[in-house]
From Swiss-Prot:
Compartment(s) of residence: Plastid
Gene Ontology molecular functions: large ribosomal subunit rRNA binding; structural constituent of ribosome
Function according to Swiss-Prot or TrEMBL: Binds to 23S rRNA.
Protein name per UniProt: Large ribosomal subunit protein uL14c
GO biological process: translation
Species of origin: Cuscuta reflexa (Southern Asian dodder)
Keywords: Plastid, Ribonucleoprotein, Ribosomal protein, RNA-binding, rRNA-binding
Keyword Ribonucleoprotein: yes
Length: 122
């Protein structure tokens, strides 16, 4: 469950290392975001000499949360961190590599490019 002011790790090589959520896209009164939701975030920590810089406002899709994800078959998945992938306006990732495991539910939300770049899909 991601809400405004939540800090997230970045799971790609776009140049950002840490994000802070400032808004959840989709509804004006929505309080929490879950896996597959798009957020507006500000970069809190960035890699030097990369295209993305600190204090830049970006869009990102959430790929891992500490809160459990319940599947229809009864399986529960929980990750060790909150992580997101920086995307552009069309929903394509800005980085060329994805780090860590991501859930297969992202394929249902039409983030097939992120799923294809990921080393492990749970």
């Amino acid at each position: 469950m991601i809400q405004p002011q939540t800090h997230l790790n970045v799971a790609d090589n776009s140049g950002a290392r840490e994000l802070m959520c400032i808004q959840i896209i989709g509804a004006s009164n929505r309080r929490y975001a879950h896996i597959g939701d798009i957020i507006v975030a500000v970069i809190k920590e960035a890699v030097p000499n990369m295209p993305l810089e600190r204090s830049e406002v970006v869009r990102a899709v959430i790929v891992r949360t500490r809160k459990e994800l319940k599947r229809d078959n009864g399986m529960i998945i929980r990750y060790d961190d909150n992580a997101a992938v920086v995307i552009d306006q069309e929903g394509n990732p800005k980085g060329t590599r994805i780090f860590g495991a991501i859930p297969r539910e992202l394929r249902q939300f039409n983030f097939t490019k992120i799923v294809s770049l990921a080393p492990e899909v749970l």
